[in-house]
Amino acid sequence: MRTLDYEKAIERIIDFIREKCSNGVVVGISGGVDSATVTYLATKALGREKVLGLIMPYYENQDVEDAKLVVESLGIEYRVINIRPIVDTIVSEIGIELDKKSLGNVMARTRMMILYAHANSMNRMVLGTSNRSEFLTGYFTKWGDGASDYAPLINLYKTEVWEIAKRIGVPERIVKKKPTAGLWEGQTDEDELGISYKLLDEILWRLVDLKMEKEKIAEDLGIPIEKVEHVENLVKGSEHKRRLPIGPSFDDLIAGP
């Protein structure tokens, strides 16, 4: 895996947030390590008066308590908004039966709307919490948790976020908990991705950053090539999530001057 100067990376993120978000930020806090890390860094950059944390549960579980631990340890303003009535109303009015993934996407997009409603009313920016591992594999909801004004962790792999979290004082129980998108009860990232973050990051770094051949990656890591192909398929299959909508080109149909 690549070697990162973590102390300088932390300073760079803090400077970035301070430069881009001087009016303040709104952060969705899930109780996971990514949102906790973003919130800690934003507070270091802007001061606690300019950071609003929104805790938006659909389920009442340990994640809510972990999210409260983050905001209370930092002393920032926060609000707990139960999205269940909103989501259930939307689903009811849609009038079709949704599977658990589709329902999870409705939850993520509901949270996005709430974040932006607060940010607009306060003239602030929404800070996203996606990391590079999620971004490259498409492990986020399009126009949901993937939507933000700035994403301080977007160029850091999940394993690097864990390291930064430890260095800036994110509570240990949050750093060590199993990552989950919180889209349904019992859901975990690694189960859904079909691979551990440690191995995923090793493959992604070689596949995307170093542009190594699949066979060489498998040989380097001592793993079946099918594992590498699985990650490659995740990256290729989610390309549409990483770009704005496109349409056909008409350049060749335009008459000359």
UniProtKB/Swiss-Prot annotation:
Chain residues that bind deamido-NAD(+): R109, K142, D149, H240, K241
Binding-site list for ATP: G28, I29, S30, G31, G32, V33, D34, S35, T129, K158, T180
Catalytic activity annotation: deamido-NAD(+) + NH4(+) + ATP = AMP + diphosphate + NAD(+) + H(+)
Disulfide bonds: none
Record-listed Mg(2+) binding positions: D34, E134
EC class (word): ligase
Pfam families: NAD_synthase
Alphabetical list of Gene3D superfamilies matching this protein: HUPs (3.40.50.620)
Annotated TM spans: none
Molecular functions (GO terms): ATP binding; glutaminase activity; metal ion binding; NAD+ synthase (glutamine-hydrolyzing) activity; NAD+ synthase activity
Residue runs in coiled coils: none
GO cellular component term of the entry, any: cytoplasm
Keyword NAD annotated: yes
Pathways per UniProt: Cofactor biosynthesis; NAD(+) biosynthesis; NAD(+) from deamido-NAD(+) (ammonia route): step 1/1
Keyword Cell membrane: no
EC numbers for this chain: 6.3.1.5
Keywords from the named record: ATP-binding, Ligase, Magnesium, Metal-binding, NAD, Nucleotide-binding
Entries under InterPro entries matching the protein: NAD/GMP_synthase, NAD_synthase, NH(3)-dep_NAD(+)_synth, Rossmann-like_a/b/a_fold
GO biological process, one term: NAD biosynthetic process
Family: Belongs to the NAD synthetase family.
Record's function text: Catalyzes the ATP-dependent amidation of deamido-NAD to form NAD. Uses ammonia as a nitrogen source.
NCBIfam families: nadE, PRK13980.1
Quaternary structure and partners: Homodimer.
Protein name: NH(3)-dependent NAD(+) synthetase
Lineage start: Archaea, Methanobacteriati, Methanobacteriota, Thermococci, Thermococcales
Gene: nadE
